[in-house]
């Protein structure tokens, strides 16, 4: 199962995080499949930068975001786009 989660980088007392798609069995800082974005919690504005196309691609493939990543997606508006695209697929008529 593929999860979208945070991978800690940075120094002591100055964390930086990468948002990555990774196999759920891999350790926290292990090898990742795709880099989706990064997070700098020390900044007050623009702390999260995402590649929306890559993130939506992995979400559509069935990757499951952690609670923290889901809240970051909600703040950026990405989660709403994903839900809308998912609802369009379900309501579209089958031929």
Swiss-Prot record:
Keywords: Ribonucleoprotein, Ribosomal protein. The gene is rpsP. InterPro entries: Ribosomal_bS16, Ribosomal_bS16_dom_sf. SUPFAM superfamilies: Ribosomal protein S16. One of its GO terms (cellular component) is small ribosomal subunit. Disruption phenotype: Probably essential, it was not disrupted in a global transposon mutagenesis study. Belongs to the bacterial ribosomal protein bS16 family. Pfam families: Ribosomal_S16. One of its GO terms (biological process) is translation. GO terms for molecular function: structural constituent of ribosome. Gene3D superfamilies: 3.30.1320.10. This is Small ribosomal subunit protein bS16.
């Amino acid at each position: 199962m593929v999860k979208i989660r945070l991978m800690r980088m940075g120094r002591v007392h100055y964390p930086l995080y990468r948002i990555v798609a990774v196999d759920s069995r891999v350790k926290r800082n292990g090898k990742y499949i795709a880099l989706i974005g990064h997070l700098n919690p020390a900044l007050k504005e623009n702390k999260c930068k995402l590649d929306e196309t890559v993130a939506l691609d992995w979400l559509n493939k069935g990757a499951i975001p952690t609670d923290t990543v889901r809240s970051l997606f909600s703040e950026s508006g990405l989660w709403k786009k994903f839900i809308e695209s998912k609802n369009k697929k379900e309501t579209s008529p089958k031929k």
